[in-house]
Design a protein with these regions (language model features):
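Non-heme di-metal
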Residues: 2-361
Length: 361
């Protein structure tokens, strides 16, 4: 039987649709390059979105003179604690930036993140000043004391730090969302009732939106690692969960009083962490629950595909790999649209590359 040569127009159409990357198993270097490239593109998308939708200032965006000055000691303790945590922004920013300095996207984003956290520090400083339960002199002395301490990174590699930050950013967002409810007068907890304050509502809402944006950025990074390095990423996530703690708490002289106020106000505690932080983060990562992630990975091995190429076959107890893949593809599509809008697709486009990994189980 003679096989007819396909029409040239059909051949041309197929070639035009061929992805600009080789098929087959990706090397570690290729995976790292793809991840880095996507992070860079995501960072650039993020900065545009940030300036368009969250362009506020801690001095001029709030009517600080209208802030109540008769809040309860318990609520004042919470505000003072938030102020204290933000005094370590120079450490949060500089140490992570230094560790990520070889990654353009990660280091550039960390600088942007630090600029946004700087606004949070100024916001809580203004809040503490206008609450008037502490004198400016006391606040100045307390700030000096706090800044004599130094926070250290909880992990010294990008993979672990990514998953740590996913959980931490969601926890921080939840703190501010629950503070917003208190400031709306919706709390029935002793020491937090009758706390309605429109200025504090706006402050908590504004900063919670920033934390949501931070959470979503690091969530996208975590999905990239889960997609291209599922076994290693899950192992890192398990380790982070086992050792997780909120940053800089141990550096506060009133750590126990602050933690107790958060707990009594139902702002943040073990229940909120398990139900509203960890479970929510795991769900967004394609993992149904804590028990599933604790079971970890059964085995990871390489097997030949039908063409004889060796591919990773990762058997995972509870990772919805297809959902992760869909989310990663959606991310690449988002940054592609951004690059199209500004013209980068004509010069240096970012492409999605399939991982080539098969998930069984």
């Amino acid at each position: 039987m003679t096989i007819a040569k396909p029409d040239e127009t059909i051949v041309k159409e197929i070639e035009e649709q061929r992805p600009p990357f080789p098929a087959g198993l990706l090397s570690r270097q290729e995976k790292d390059r793809i991840i880095e490239r996507c992070i860079r593109a995501l960072y650039r998308w993020y900065t545009v979105r940030s300036q368009e939708s969250r362009n506020w200032h801690p001095d001029s965006s709030f009517n600080w003179r209208a802030l109540r000055t008769d809040h309860s000691p318990e609520l004042n303790t919470v505000i003072e604690g938030f102020f204290a945590i933000e005094q370590y922004v120079p450490d949060y920013t500089s140490k992570a930036t230094h560790m990520m300095r070889k990654s353009y996207g990660r280091s550039q984003y960390q600088l942007r993140w630090g600029a946004e956290e700087e606004k949070h520090a100024d916001l809580w400083l203004n809040t503490l000043l206008f609450l008037r339960f502490r004198t400016p002199e006391w606040i100045e002395d307390y700030m000096d004391f706090l800044r004599n301490g130094e926070w250290q990174l909880p992990w010294d590699d990008a993979l672990h730090l990514t998953f740590y930050t996913v959980i931490q950013e969601r926890a921080t967002q939840l703190n501010y969302l629950n503070l917003e409810l208190i400031a709306m007068g919706k709390s029935d907890k002793p020491g937090f009732t009758n706390s309605a304050d429109p200025v504090l509502v706006k402050a908590a809402k504004t900063i919670a939106r920033d934390e949501a944006a931070h959470f979503n950025f690091f969530l996208e990074l975590a999905r990239l690692y889960l997609y291209y390095y599922p076994a290693q990423a899950l192992e890192a996530l398990v380790e982070v969960i086992k050792h997780f703690g909120m940053p800089a708490m141990h550096l506060l002289p009133e750590e126990s009083r602050f933690a107790e106020a958060l707990y009594q106000g139902a702002i943040y505690g073990p229940r909120q962490y398990t139900r509203d932080v960890l479970q929510m983060a795991l769900k967004n990562l394609g993992i149904p629950n804590r028990k599933a992630i604790d079971e970890g990975i059964k085995r990871s091995r390489q097997v030949p595909d039908p063409d004889g190429n060796m591919r990773d076959t990762v058997i995972v107890d509870a990772l919805d790999y297809h959902a992760v893949e869909t989310a990663v593809m959606r991310l690449f599509d988002r940054v592609r649209k951004h690059e199209e809008k500004i013209g980068l697709t004509e010069i240096d486009p970012t492409y999605f590359v399939p991982s080539g990994i098969t998930i069984e189980g």
